[in-house]
């Protein structure tokens, strides 16, 4: 067997490799599942952060999602990318969790790494802008917010988002249009030019 196809961690780096991993998971390969888990845990965490804003809920949804991947790997038919299939599971689980979870959204400050330490004014401005964007995103309806973040933060196509959210592509286009329009209004005056 080719050493590249024998290493699950290497397979998790390409769409074709991910599909191979899902096939191996369906056959009970724990190493393949571990590789997929490691690849998707942080991606799903970032996706769900902007949806739920609850660390405990995020971890629970990610784990539930990946457990569903383990259990239902045999049902993956290859009609979409593995990422689309997994994000769709996470989206549905998050929607269910949010309906059952009636707690206020946490507006805590995120720790930002890699900020230019020599320029405190830039660091402050970056944090201010990040909070403004987060606050504006939080005001969008869940469907618009989800479509927008899948486009912006996860670089997914409208067709992939439509698969994840189980709706027509035109609905995604409309949601993105309204999200951009609303964000432009909410962020008007927030962006300042630096000298």
Language-model features, listed with the residues they occupy:
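C-terminal edge and immediately downstream basic/flexible tail or linker adjoining helix-turn-helix-like DNA-binding
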Residues: 1-8, 12-13, 24, 132-135, ...
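Internal acidic/polar
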Residues: 2-7, 14-18, 96, 101-130
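Short, charged helix-capping/linker segments at alpha-helix termini
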Residues: 3-5, 26-35, 45-64, 169, ...
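Short, small-hydrophobic-rich alpha-helical interface motif
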Residues: 25, 40, 44, 48, ...
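Sigma70-family region 2
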Residues: 26-27, 53, 63-81, 99-101
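Amphipathic, Lys/Arg- and hydrophobic-enriched alpha-helical face
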Residues: 37-55, 72, 87, 137, ...
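Arg/Lys-rich amphipathic alpha helix in sigma70-family domain 2
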Residues: 71-78, 88-107, 126, 178
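Helix-turn-helix DNA-binding module
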Residues: 135-138, 142-146, 150, 154-171
């Amino acid at each position: 067997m080719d050493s590249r196809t024998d290493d699950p961690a290497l397979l998790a780096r390409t769409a074709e490799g991910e599909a191979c991993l899902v096939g191996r998971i369906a056959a009970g390969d724990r190493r393949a599942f571990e590789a997929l888990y490691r690849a998707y845990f942080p991606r799903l965490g970032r996706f769900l952060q902007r949806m739920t804003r609850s660390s405990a809920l995020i971890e629970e949804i990610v784990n539930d999602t990946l457990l569903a991947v383990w259990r239902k790997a045999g049902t993956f038919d290859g009609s979409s990318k593995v990422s689309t299939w997994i994000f769709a599971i996470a989206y549905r689980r998050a929607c269910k969790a949010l309906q059952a979870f009636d707690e206020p959204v946490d507006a805590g400050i995120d720790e930002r790494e890699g900020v230019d330490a020599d320029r405190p004014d830039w660091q402050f401005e970056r944090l201010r802008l990040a909070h403004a964007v987060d606050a504006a995103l939080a005001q969008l309806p869940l469907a618009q917010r989800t479509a927008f973040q899948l486009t912006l933060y996860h670089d997914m196509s409208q067709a992939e988002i439509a698969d994840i959210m189980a709706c027509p592509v035109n609905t995604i286009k409309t949601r993105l249009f309204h999200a951009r329009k609303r964000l432009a209004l909410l962020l008007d005056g927030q962006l300042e030019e630096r000298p």
